[in-house]
Amino acid sequence: MYNTDIVIIGSGPVGLFAVFQAGMLGMKCHVIDAQEVIGGQCITLYPEKHIYDIPAYPKITAKELIEQLKSQAAPFNPVYHLNQQAIELNKHNDFFEIKTSKNTIIKSKVIIIAAGAGAFGPNKPPLANIEDFEGKSIFYFINDKSKFLGKNIVVAGGGDSAVDWTIALSEIANKIYLVHRRDKFTAATESIRQLRHIAETGKIELVTGYQLNNLDGHNNELQAVIVKDLQNNIRKLDANILLPFFGLKQDLGPLANWGLNVKLQHIEVDNYYYQTNIKGIYAIGDVAHYVGKLKLIITGFAEAAHSINHAYSRVFDGKALHFEYSTNKYEQKQ
């Protein structure tokens, strides 16, 4: 059994920043993550994707952001329990006891849930024999964009992932078709502006008003993607790669059975300290829900700071926290 001050569930950017914030206040952390590596969705789904709304970074890849956050938290020696889920919660007086899928038991006074989308998987389009092409011609996540050099690509979807990856891959692909059932996209305004600008050059073709209908290929290699509009007009797009981006299926898994207030796979918290209905358990980042919630990494960073500062008095039995600027606190830790 391990004893610590705080258990953080999730090692994405918000969870890692919570480790740093806790360390600055002298609190030790153990981190549980179901993935084999630190970084959450940033590493598992889009390590090479650029992020543009992190302060002081005009752009930074998801992988670079995680590396920076790991380095920032490293001086406080967090203990990581990877490739295992938090499955069981018990409470003993003022302490929580968590058991993982690998029978690891951790005792702490505070739990911070920063689980992002929880256990996630792609929403797959209902296409016949799609599994024959998965992993060779059809991909739901991009870990290495260099494999798409010179390819003819169909990207399907209208949200941030579809638009952002269309823009990013246009630099290396031979041709990209972006297929969306509507004329309007739901991505960031600036991303849509960039998309339409590149489309004017002919590098990207916007195939709007169409949906995926069928696949054409043999020996697990795609040769064309068939799309159809509402009037049943058919187009055959010559392509050897299909990237469907229709969002993720979210599943809180065992966390949903912990007695927390859960709504639509999100954990409800107050909008002051991001504490759940169980005192001592907080939820931050994309997994948390409250009125006015904004799903941004920077919002999760602020939630981490608030929740960790509020948790201080619980960890140290009611001791008051006296505010200090990070310059002074960090120098004292070194």
From Swiss-Prot:
GO terms for molecular function: ferredoxin-NADP+ reductase activity; flavin adenine dinucleotide binding; NADP binding. InterPro entries: FAD/NAD-bd_sf, FAD/NAD-binding_dom, Fd--NADP_Rdtase_type_2, Ferredoxin-NADP_redctase_2. This is Ferredoxin--NADP reductase. Binds 1 FAD per subunit. Its EC number is 1.18.1.2. Keywords: FAD, Flavoprotein, NADP, Oxidoreductase. Its cofactor is FAD. FAD binds at residues 33, 41, 46, 86, 120, 286, 327. It comes from Rickettsia typhi (strain ATCC VR-144 / Wilmington).
